[in-house]
């Protein structure tokens, strides 16, 4: 467990109550990932690896050759890299500076991933009905109010093709 937490200002515990008090969404998300090491989250234990592998196996049931995937809240790119290396066209959107840096560090010229730093509430850079598969595994955890959650889901629906699939993760 300790590998996926970074030490910040001498503490190794995330203070969720303090983070929750930050009203500005971008600041709250950035502060969270300054502390939390998203780059190793899905690999830090056997249980985490099972979560990742179970998720991708389920998604693969719905993929067809040539599908375009949008990974909203892509983190450090675990799902984006997996699907891009399987030959799918992947676009990744991520808000947190730390995750963008970790993602870019792993990105090679062979990786066909369009990585953009941006907010899940604003997918205006993407045309309507432009993706076969939309992954929404992170942003809903961070959005505090129902209106923002609904906007995020509406944007995901807007960019998903008719007959496409949207995969959500939310607690």
What does each of the following model-derived ranges do?
Residues 124-134:
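A short acidic, Gly/Pro-enriched loop at the edge of an enzyme's catalytic core
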Residues 133-147:
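A short SAM/SAH-binding and catalytic strip from SAM-dependent methyltransferases
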Residues 163-170:
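Conserved beta-strand signature within the Rossmann-like core of class I S-adenosyl-L-methionine
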Residues 150-162:
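A short glycine-rich, Lys/Arg-flanked "PGG" loop and its adjoining helix->strand segment in the class I
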């Amino acid at each position: 467990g300790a590998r996926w937490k970074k030490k910040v200002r001498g503490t190794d515990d995330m203070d969720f109550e303090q983070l929750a008090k930050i009203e500005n969404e971008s600041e709250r998300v950035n502060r969270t990932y300054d502390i939390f090491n998203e780059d190793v989250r899905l690999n830090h234990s056997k249980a985490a690896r099972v979560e990742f592998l179970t998720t991708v196996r389920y998604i693969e049931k719905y993929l067809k050759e040539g599908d375009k995937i949008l990974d909203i809240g892509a983190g450090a790119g675990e799902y984006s890299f997996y699907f891009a290396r399987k030959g799918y066209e992947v676009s990744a959107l991520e808000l947190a500076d730390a995750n963008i840096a970790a993602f870019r560090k792993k990105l090679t010229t062979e990786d066909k991933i369009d990585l953009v730093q941006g907010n899940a509430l604003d997918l205006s850079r993407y045309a309507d009905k432009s993706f076969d598969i939309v992954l929404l595994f992170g942003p809903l955890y961070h959005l505090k109010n129902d209106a923002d959650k609904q906007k995020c889901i509406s944007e995901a629906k807007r960019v998903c093709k008719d007959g496409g699939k949207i995969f959500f993760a939310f607690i």
